[in-house]
Regions:
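Intrinsically disordered, charged low-complexity linkers and terminal tails
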Residues: 1-200
Length: 200
């Protein structure tokens, strides 16, 4: 899935539709692991007209991903703003610092009597006080969305979230400002819609 820049569900649907044929399949209870050789990956990439994603395209890919503005919930925006705020000179940010900002964003909304997010969001006063639950939630979504596309990585041993070195080395001051501006603008638009939908 990561080779093709799509999610696992897309790969599974392609296999069911006969567009891909894995060389090996391993069953683990209700789950199945599909394996492809590098040659097969390239063959299907050409057959399906899938663009190659590598270090040379990663910055373009990153901004294209942000431009999609795929926000089923607000998570990506406060998460990325927190990462940018704490990222150091080698592209690392301590997960604890990111998490503190992430929690603080939602706690501030509760304190001000504003909706935390859409009704499907589980964040409430109780959950926001449970740092372990919040870290699990943040690493599942939104972090995993960035990890799947190889923009960010998490080192449990070092307790840091790191930006892909190839991407970090291409990011200039103007790029960071561009990301920050988009996230702030997208947050404002997102919550204008959420608050507009709230019945007072």
């Amino acid at each position: 899935a990561r080779e093709y820049f799509v999610n696992t569900g897309t790969i599974t649907s392609w296999i069911r539709a006969g567009k891909l044929t894995p060389e090996v399949q391993y069953k683990f209870g209700s789950k199945t692991l599909y394996l492809f050789s590098p040659d097969e990956v390239e063959k299907y990439r050409k057959q399906l007209g899938i663009k190659e994603h590598n270090d040379a395209t990663i910055k373009e890919d990153f901004f294209a991903f942000l431009e999609e503005r795929d926000y089923s919930l607000s998570y990506k925006m406060p998460f990325l703003l927190a990462f940018i705020r704490h990222v150091d000179s080698i592209g690392d940010a301590k997960i604890e610092e990111i998490l503190e900002d992430y929690i603080a964003f939602y706690q501030d909304r509760i304190t001000r009597g504003l909706p935390v997010d859409r009704s499907t969001c589980p964040y409430n006063e109780t959950m926001l006080q449970d740092k372990k639950a919040m870290q699990r939630s943040m690493l599942t979504n939104p972090f995993e969305k960035f990890e799947r596309k190889r923009f960010l990585y998490y080192s449990k041993d070092l307790s840091v979230i790191s930006m892909n070195h190839a991407l970090y080395s291409q990011m200039e001051a103007g790029d960071w400002k561009r990301v920050r501006r988009q996230m702030e603008e997208d947050l404002a638009e997102y919550y204008a819609k959420v608050e507009g939908a709230v019945v007072v």
